[in-house]
Amino acid sequence: MAAAMMNKSVLLNKQCGKPAAVPKVVMSKGGFARTSAVNKNRDMMVWQPFNNKMFETFSFLPPLTDEQISKQVDYILANSWTPCLEFAASDQAYAGNENCIRMGPVASTYQDNRYWTMWKLPMFGCTDGSQVLSEIQACTNAFPDAYIRLVCFDANRQVQISGFLVHRPPSATDYRLPADRQV
């Protein structure tokens, strides 16, 4: 039956005009079909639930370089979004029972109940990426042991569009390489 289903998927893919890489079906001794792709250990790993904290956009990546941050700032400004810097001490950066404001029966991990301190004012009308980068540097110099993130807002939709870390404290041990995030 599995082979018949595989043949149908090949036919459907041929009708679409796109060649499809269909995994080879292997029958085990117990009569169960398995694909060869499942044999890879990496495909079946379990997410590490402890000390695997992440922030917003790009938090699954290694810390961004200055050049990568500059490209993101250019993208933000090209879309006419308003950049804004926020910072938080290490013990206040993650959502938790100690640092969340609760309004009703809301879980402590709900992101909107956790606020970071704003660095100056949002950069309304900013058109030069170097201004944003110099503010990131000034905030980093003022608070070297804090998490600093860049968020951007769309005035038309009146929502936050993106947010990502631009600085982690040197003492931070929360970042894990992608290979270390799984058991």
UniProtKB/Swiss-Prot annotation:
Keyword Chloroplast attributed: yes
Gene3D superfamilies: Ribulose bisphosphate carboxylase, small subunit (3.30.190.10)
First and last residues of the transit peptide: 1-42
Subcellular location, record wording: Plastid, Chloroplast
InterPro entries according to UniProt: RuBisCO_ssu, RuBisCO_ssu_dom, RuBisCO_ssu_sf
Keywords in alphabetical order: Calvin cycle, Carbon dioxide fixation, Chloroplast, Photorespiration, Photosynthesis, Plastid, Transit peptide
GO cellular component: chloroplast
Pfam families: RuBisCO_small (PF00101)
Superkingdom field: Eukaryota
Gene Ontology molecular-function annotations: ribulose-bisphosphate carboxylase activity
GO terms of biological process kind: photorespiration; reductive pentose-phosphate cycle
Primary location recorded for the protein, binned into one broad class: plastid
Family: Belongs to the RuBisCO small chain family.
Subunit annotation: Heterohexadecamer of 8 large and 8 small subunits.
Function per UniProt: RuBisCO catalyzes two reactions: the carboxylation of D-ribulose 1,5-bisphosphate, the primary event in carbon dioxide fixation, as well as the oxidative fragmentation of the pentose substrate. Both reactions occur simultaneously and in competition at the same active site. Although the small subunit is not catalytic it is essential for maximal activity.
Note: The basic functional RuBisCO is composed of a large chain homodimer in a 'head-to-tail' conformation. In form I RuBisCO this homodimer is arranged in a barrel-like tetramer with the small subunits forming a tetrameric 'cap' on each end of the 'barrel'.
The name this protein goes by in its record: Ribulose bisphosphate carboxylase small subunit, chloroplastic 5
Taxonomic source organism: Acetabularia acetabulum
